[in-house]
């Protein structure tokens, strides 16, 4: 109750945005402090000699970007994503959230075609807002990529901005995954479509680069991509947070000429050790090392000098 009261009065404070802009110019607070210094409004993130605009809703993702720029959120993933975007013509962002990956791709390669998919309607609206304030030509889709076409569902909470929903996962599984009581979740219907169907209906000639962050639904995504995966063989960045997902992806991608790299983010802790190369070549996708992985051909390995 005290925490809620404090948050209520904090939200009433005027001019927080401008105060934090001033603080950021003078010094960088510790993470323990700045994680509490949030506001609502537009801010800019430097991307090379350009800047992109992000609408801050108060999430950790946006706060990290505000205080530390691209070094604050998945820096090694974003760094290689920018390089890959520059080399890619058609880019897909599955589980786009606020659109940071899509925005960076378009900023780095304005001539590229970018498709962003986000099934949660209020997050989709935020995605659209970020695309609009940057005046970017990014095609946004309020649907989920899955293994069938039609309607699916997910269990959502009442948080203004949610960071994870699990398509077609049971209520008990969703509650366990989110670490909340079942009573706090409600069922939401959403349109689902396979990549193969989307490619056919949209006359998509190829996919060069794809980011997939769909909260354990990755195997179903690839089940619906079987027809075109072998033909397109896109470069992939995929979040793997369970061994069974890694094992399934290894089975589906083996024999297609992909190299696997664990993207080692500098956050410390068990899953993301501070020491080590940023992109570590691995032979397996299991073993409890969770985070983002890069999947690419020998040509990409050579061009980016990954080994």
Short names for language-model regions:
Residues 1-120, 125-193, ...:
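S-adenosyl-L-methionine
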Residues 59, 145, 159, 197, ...:
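Residues that form or immediately flank small-molecule/cofactor binding pockets and catalytic motifs
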Residues 68-92, 168-232, 244, 248:
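Short internal loop-to-helix segment that lines adenine-nucleotide cofactor pockets
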Residues 96-98, 121, 145-147, 214-216, ...:
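Short, glycine/acidic-enriched loop or turn micro-motifs at the edges of active sites
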Residues 99-102, 124, 148, 218-219, ...:
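Short, well-ordered alpha-helical microsegments
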Residues 105, 127, 154, 221-225, ...:
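Hydrophobic packing residues within well-ordered alpha-helices of enzyme cores
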Residues 117, 195-200, 205-231, 235-237, ...:
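Internal alpha/beta domain cores that form substrate/cofactor-binding pockets in large enzymes
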């Amino acid at each position: 109750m005290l925490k809620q009261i404090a948050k209520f009065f904090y939200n009433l404070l005027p001019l927080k945005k401008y105060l934090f802009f001033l603080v950021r110019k003078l010094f960088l607070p510790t993470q323990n402090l700045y994680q509490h210094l949030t506001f609502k409004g537009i801010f800019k993130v430097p991307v090379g000699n350009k800047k992109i605009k992000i609408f801050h809703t108060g999430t950790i993702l946006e706060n990290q970007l505000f205080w530390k720029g691209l070094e604050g959120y998945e820096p090694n993933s974003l760094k290689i994503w920018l390089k890959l975007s520059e080399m890619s013509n058609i880019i897909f962002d599955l589980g786009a959230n606020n659109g940071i990956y899509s925005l960076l791709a378009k900023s780095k390669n304005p001539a590229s075609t970018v498709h962003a998919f986000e099934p949660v309607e209020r997050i989709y609206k935020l995605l659209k807002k970020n695309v609009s304030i940057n005046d970017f030509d990014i095609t946004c889709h309020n649907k989920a990529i899955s293994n069938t076409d039609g309607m699916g569902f997910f269990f959502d909470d009442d948080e203004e901005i949610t960071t994870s929903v699990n398509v077609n996962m049971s209520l008990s599984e969703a509650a366990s995954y989110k670490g909340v009581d079942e009573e706090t979740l409600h069922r939401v219907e959403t349109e689902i479509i396979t990549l193969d169907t989307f490619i056919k209906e949209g006359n998509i000639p190829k996919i060069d680069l794809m980011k997939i962050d769909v909260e354990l639904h990755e195997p179903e995504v690839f089940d619906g991509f079987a027809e075109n995966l072998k033909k397109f063989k896109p470069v992939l960045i995929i979040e793997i947070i369970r061994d069974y997902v890694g094992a399934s992806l290894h089975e589906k991608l083996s024999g297609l000429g992909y190299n696997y790299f664990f993207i080692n983010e500098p956050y410390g802790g068990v899953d993301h050790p501070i020491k080590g190369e940023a992109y570590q070549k691995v032979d397996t996708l299991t073993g409890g090392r969770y985070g983002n992985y890069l999947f690419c051909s020998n040509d990409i390995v050579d061009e980016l000098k990954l080994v």
